């Protein structure tokens, strides 16, 4: 039996040297089954497992070899290397210490000694950055740690957790799923998967994952905190929505504001809460605050079409037509619908109208002013700004008053004529078409002759 086992080992060595590690593994296993008390066979198979990156199995074999032969130096070397690859700093240090006790001048683990020191420093740096929520730094330093300890599931999952906090949920999920394939009962992996669901606005499934992690590990504090946060956020969002639907807008505003304080990292949820609060602001007349909320939504998610359309509407209501046009143009790039095309067309028309003279404003009347109100307004303003009243003023003041007098006449000429007024209200550029030869003095004389007779006269109060 021993002879056959030795032959198996030799064949295994040949396959190992040829880098046929799977074949070598089978041959070493055959040798072990024939001679289970050989520390060397376990040592060889441990080396083979290491080449296959199966550090857990390699560590098991190396430790078994040590139990069979406590003076087996190579086995301790392999334990140190495996512990280092698995991120077990204490295990690696103990193995290195034993090797040096067996052979004080041994150069076998010089690199590993340096790597252990570096890994310990990296762990401290990672923890400090994690505590201050500097998650990008954590990922950076964990990448360095994983170069030393590539099989450390703890490092992988902590990196995945931080990636989730950074919104890189696809990457985080890939890591978590990979770990779960190795260990389906990993509470940390299930926790990370729950985080990814939570940060992609799937609170219900997130809660289920946190509860599953707690079933596997009742003391899993992160899952406890996240389950509580999920439930609180879900409840507050639903409460805010209920208050909004029932018209209790100011109460809804308070709830949405409080909900936004729960987790600044949850961009998907916060963008919805901000959009909902923006809607509330429009209902209570706080259009500028609504725009600020929409700005924050679009900073979190530039593709959030509803926020873009709401901001455009607020700009339009505030007569900030250029901003409204810009928003509708961006919205049209995201979704080319007939409704958005119509909104853009209307905004451009409103912008064009806004650049014309505002005859209602010039006369100081409302847009629904009656014919009599328009006449009274013209009479009052024409008398105030008539050039004769300012004959003794400076040249600059006379010029200014003449311009105002002319504009007042133009305004009255349009608003007192039903056809022209209708065209003006519809947005047509009447000024260019019909006002080119307008004479404000003729308008003034005609008005007062019509109002007071052929010999009507008036006196200015200087």
Question: What are the residue ranges of the model-derived segments?
Answer:
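Residue-level recognition of tetratricopeptide repeat
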Residues: 4, 38, 55, 72, ...
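J-domain (Hsp40/DnaJ) module recognition
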Residues: 241, 323-368, 387-462
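Short "pre-J" leader segments immediately N-terminal to J/J-like domains in DnaJ-family
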Residues: 199-233, 243, 248-254, 283-292, ...
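TPR alpha-solenoid repeat register
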Residues: 41, 75, 108-109, 155, ...
């Amino acid at each position: 039996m021993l002879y056959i086992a030795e032959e198996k080992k030799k064949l295994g060595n040949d396959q190992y040297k040829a880098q046929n590690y799977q074949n070598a593994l089978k041959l070493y296993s055959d040798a072990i089954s024939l001679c289970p008390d050989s520390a060397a066979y376990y040592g060889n198979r441990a080396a083979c497992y290491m080449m296959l990156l199966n550090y857990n199995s390699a560590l098991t074999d190396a430790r078994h070899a040590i139990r069979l032969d406590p003076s087996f130096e190579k086995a301790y070397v392999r334990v140190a290397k495996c512990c280092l690859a698995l991120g077990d700093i204490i295990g690696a240090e103990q193995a290195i210490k034993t090797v040096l006790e067996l052979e004080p001048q041994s150069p076998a683990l010089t690199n590993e000694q340096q790597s252990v020191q570096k890994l310990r420093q990296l762990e401290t740096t990672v923890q400090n950055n994690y505590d201050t929520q500097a998650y990008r730094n954590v990922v950076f330093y964990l990448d360095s740690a994983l170069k030393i300890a590539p099989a450390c599931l703890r490092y992988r999952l902590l990196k995945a957790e931080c990636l989730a906090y950074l919104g890189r949920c696809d990457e985080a999920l890939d890591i978590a799923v990979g770990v779960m394939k190795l260990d389906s009962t990993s509470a940390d992996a299930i926790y990370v998967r729950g985080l990814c669901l939570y940060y992609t606005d799937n609170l219900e499934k997130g809660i289920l994952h946190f509860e599953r992690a707690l079933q596997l590990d009742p003391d899993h504090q992160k899952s406890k905190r996240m389950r509580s946060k999920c439930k609180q956020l879900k409840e507050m969002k639903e409460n805010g929505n209920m208050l909004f639907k029932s018209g209790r807008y100011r109460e809804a505003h308070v709830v949405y504001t409080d909900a936004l304080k729960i987790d600044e990292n949850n961009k998907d949820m916060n963008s919805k809460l901000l959009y909902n609060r923006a809607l509330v602001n429009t209902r209570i007349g706080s259009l500028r605050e609504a725009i600020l909320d929409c700005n924050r939504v679009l900073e979190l998610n530039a593709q959030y079409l509803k926020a873009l359309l709401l901001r455009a509407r607020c700009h339009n209501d505030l007569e900030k037509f250029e901003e409204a046009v810009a928003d509708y143009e961006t919205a049209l790039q995201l979704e080319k619908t007939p409704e958005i095309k119509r909104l853009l067309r209307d905004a451009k028309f409103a912008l064009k109208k806004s650049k014309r003279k505002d005859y209602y404003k010039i006369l100081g009347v409302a847009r629904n002013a009656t014919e009599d109100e328009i006449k009274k307004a013209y009479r009052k303003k024409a008398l105030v700004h008539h050039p004769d009243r300012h004959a003794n003023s400076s040249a600059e003041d006379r010029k200014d008053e003449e311009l105002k007098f002319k504009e007042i006449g133009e305004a009255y000429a349009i608003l007192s004529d039903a056809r022209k007024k209708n065209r003006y209200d519809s947005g047509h550029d009447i000024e260019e078409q019909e006002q080119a030869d307008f004479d404000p003095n003729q308008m003034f004389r005609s008005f007062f002759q019509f109002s007071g007779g052929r010999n009507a006269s008036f006196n200015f109060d200087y």
